[in-house]
Amino acid sequence: MQRVGAASPTCSSLQAPAAAPPILTISPHHRVKTAETAAEPDLLEPTGVHHPFHSLSPLTEARAWAAREGQYFNGLIEANGGASVSKGHPDLAVTFLTDHASCEWFFSQRQEVLDRQDGAYFGPLKCKKQYIGESLPTLASNQKESHQVLREHKLRVFRSRVPFAQSAMTNATDTFYKNLRDNGTGDYTVVYDFFLQQTIHFLHEWIYGLGVEGGQPLPPFKDFMNANPLDVSVLLELEMDTPVANLAAKLAQRSKKPSAEQLASVESIAEAIRSSDVWAGFVEMLEDSNVNTKDLERSFMFTTNFQSAGAIAKGMMPVVATLTNNPEFLEKLRKEVDGKDLTFQSIRGAENFPLLDSFHWEINRMFPAPAFTVKEAKMDLVVPTSSGKKYKVKKGELLMMEQALGQMDPSVFGPDAREFNPERFVDNPELKKKVFAYGYVDHDKVDGQWGCAAHAIGMLDGILKIIYGRWVQEAEWELTSVPVISPDEFLAEVGPADMSFAKVTSRKKM
């Protein structure tokens, strides 16, 4: 969902010399290196367009990509003869990977094979310093030593809070639905805004002890709305790798400067974190490990507000949309969860709630976050594809792995791979292993150098399933418009972007 980055190196030519050295191909399963030569007849070069150094086209291509990502990739794949590996230039000159085999290969590589672009966090976007100060945005997963050390110690901090997750979830969710019974939606009818109230409360009580547990109140919710808006362009800046396009992008983004009110809200949240009962212990824990703690509260704020609470609230848009468009499944799911206590223990695995579990994994499959990842080839490589074709990539080139497309590969998920099927995994639970959940190929091995931290500490599946299940138990709703669920339009998302409730009522009596 979020992208951060600095300007990429100029894309080198893909033409191989007559006597090319061996190119390494890495097995996605065993990571065994075997040499293949560029002279092999089945080794292909990606086709497509990388724009000239002084072109404005990366900006116009980026706009087309952002506006209708599904249409963009349909056109790209068609223009390249159906190839699942091809070149494109939406802000950065990249080689796209768009099928299951190439995505699995991408996720499986060690940092000496594929690494984040030097200094980059999410690819072509970077977070504005007004939000993170001098800190690195945590969990960004680039392999710079300072980040990797910080990530490991933050995971240790988060693990120390695992015993408090259940009480925080119970308090936040009970409060959220009591407010619904008492006040309806109030001022927050946009789906993202509505659920952000719940996710902000949960994350800040769980990680910082704010709210019910610690007795210290949360800052006003309007501060979180100001600091974590649905239009995230106010937090992020787009980077281009051609000077003309980069200048045009910066001029266009001048109107997106954070306001004085937004900056005051950021400071309000940062101060609440610094003042929490647990913060001094966090800082001491990290200082004892020689971690630079300058602006550390802003790094944590970026994690709990933007990457966690904001991401879960945005993820509720496809949840609401797919349940709205599948009323028969919604009724079946209600029969499964009604009257049941949804806890981290009870929802573990699929045994107790097979429909809820399958729905959760289908959401993961079609609406992954992040939907793509950018990394740099640290050596000449060969990329496998689901069709059996192999493509060569040169050292220094950027690869953009499109996870949502890889998880809609019909060779793995069948002829209905581009359709939402909430019961897809009920009778075929092994198929879940083909979903790259939160950036992991192997769901049982979460100690990798990238991938979601909440999953790494064993919490994210439970968090999401409880939030989904409680919504089904607690609420009846109507939307202001029919949701658009089409990968030909909104890849890894649903439309419209400002999806809103016409009405939400409690299913439970006052």
From Swiss-Prot:
Its EC number is 4.2.1.-. It is found in: Mitochondrion. The gene is HPB. The lineage of its organism: Eukaryota, Sar, Stramenopiles, Ochrophyta, PX clade. It is an enzyme of class 4 (lyase). It catalyses: (13S)-hydroperoxy-(9Z,11E,15Z)-octadecatrienoate = plasmodiophorol A; (13S)-hydroperoxy-(9Z,11E,15Z)-octadecatrienoate = plasmodiophorol B; (13S)-hydroperoxy-(9Z,11E,15Z)-octadecatrienoate = ectocarpin A + H2O; (15S)-hydroperoxy-(5Z,8Z,11Z,13E,17Z)-eicosapentaenoate = ectocarpin B + H2O. Pfam families: p450 (PF00067). Belongs to the cytochrome P450 family. Heme binds at residue 452. The keyword Lyase applies. One of its GO terms (biological process) is fatty acid biosynthetic process. Its cofactor is heme. This is Hydroperoxide bicyclase CYP5164A3, mitochondrial. Optimum pH is 7.5. Keywords: Fatty acid biosynthesis, Fatty acid metabolism, Iron, Lipid biosynthesis, Lipid metabolism, Lyase, Metal-binding, Mitochondrion, Oxylipin biosynthesis, Transit peptide. One of its GO terms (cellular component) is mitochondrion. SUPFAM superfamilies: Cytochrome P450. It comes from Ectocarpus siliculosus. Residues 1-31 form a transit peptide.
